[in-house]
């Protein structure tokens, strides 16, 4: 299996983003951080975790978004570093959307040709009273159907309307088909987190080896 690593830098007038990813876990780093020393020191430990198998450090400037991306990386088995400086003086839209786009681009680059993997993945994840389901296809046909049933205007400092939009942006850039549904639950934090964890479980299954070196498609290509 290849290293399945990528580094993406995405700079616009609205955001500056750097992402390092390894779909296999293991060591990764960003040598030239775009974050100032104060930002690095004030980074949330809640969204940073280093073990022998994974390195995760998420700093988008939006706490709940950090928390969700951390959960996605952890349960997908990725190592992931995300640095973002966004125009949060306006609102959280550009930061959230652009992080989804950049993460999708990094995922797509790290994955490379879809060959020798299951391609399809299904995941369920509970969090207390909440239960979510996710289905993934490494199809190269970007499509996202997201139904989380969120009712609050915000969770922490993240607008709830941006949570499905992040997933849509990620799927579009990664060229995935994803269906993510929260089946039950009354706490919007739990509903969101269970959805991201279910997606992680589904992605992890879709990337698992299928015992061949074939392209898992009747077309013979997924590109």
UniProtKB/Swiss-Prot annotation:
InterPro entries: IGPD_sf, ImidazoleglycerolP_deHydtase, ImidazoleglycerP_deHydtase_CS, Ribosomal_Su5_D2-typ_SF. Pathway: Amino-acid biosynthesis; L-histidine biosynthesis; L-histidine from 5-phospho-alpha-D-ribose 1-diphosphate: step 6/9. Pfam families: IGPD. It comes from the Eukaryota. It is an enzyme of class 4 (lyase). GO terms for molecular function: imidazoleglycerol-phosphate dehydratase activity. GO terms for biological process: L-histidine biosynthetic process. It catalyses: D-erythro-1-(imidazol-4-yl)glycerol 3-phosphate = 3-(imidazol-4-yl)-2-oxopropyl phosphate + H2O. Its EC number is 4.2.1.19. Keywords: Amino-acid biosynthesis, Histidine biosynthesis, Lyase. Coiled coil: none annotated. Signal peptide: none annotated. Belongs to the imidazoleglycerol-phosphate dehydratase family. HAMAP family: HisB. NCBIfam families: PRK00951.2-4. This is Imidazoleglycerol-phosphate dehydratase. It comes from Torulaspora delbrueckii. The lineage of its organism: Eukaryota, Fungi, Dikarya, Ascomycota, Saccharomycotina.
């Amino acid at each position: 299996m290849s290293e399945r690593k990528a580094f993406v830098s995405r700079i616009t007038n609205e955001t500056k983003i750097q992402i390092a990813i390894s779909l296999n876990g293991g060591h990764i780093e960003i040598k030239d951080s775009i974050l100032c020393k104060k930002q690095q020191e004030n980074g949330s430990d809640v969204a940073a975790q280093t073990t022998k198998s994974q390195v995760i450090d998420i700093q988008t400037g939006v706490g709940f978004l950090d928390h969700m991306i951390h959960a996605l990386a952890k349960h997908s088995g990725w190592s992931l570093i995300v640095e973002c400086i966004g125009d949060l003086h306006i609102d959280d839209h550009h930061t959230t959307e652009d992080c989804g786009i950049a993460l999708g681009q990094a995922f797509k680059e790290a994955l490379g040709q879809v060959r020798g993997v299951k391609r399809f993945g299904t995941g369920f994840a509970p969090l207390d009273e909440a239960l979510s389901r996710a289905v993934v296809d490494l199809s190269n046909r970007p499509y996202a159907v997201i139904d989380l049933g969120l009712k609050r205007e915000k969770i922490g400092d993240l607008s709830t309307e941006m949570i499905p939009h992040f997933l849509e942006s990620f799927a579009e850039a990664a060229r995935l088909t994803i269906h993510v549904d929260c089946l039950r639950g009354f706490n919007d934090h739990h509903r969101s987190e269970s959805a991201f964890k279910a997606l992680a479980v589904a992605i992890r299954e879709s990337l698992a080896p299928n015992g061949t070196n074939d392209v898992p498609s009747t077309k013979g290509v997924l590109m």
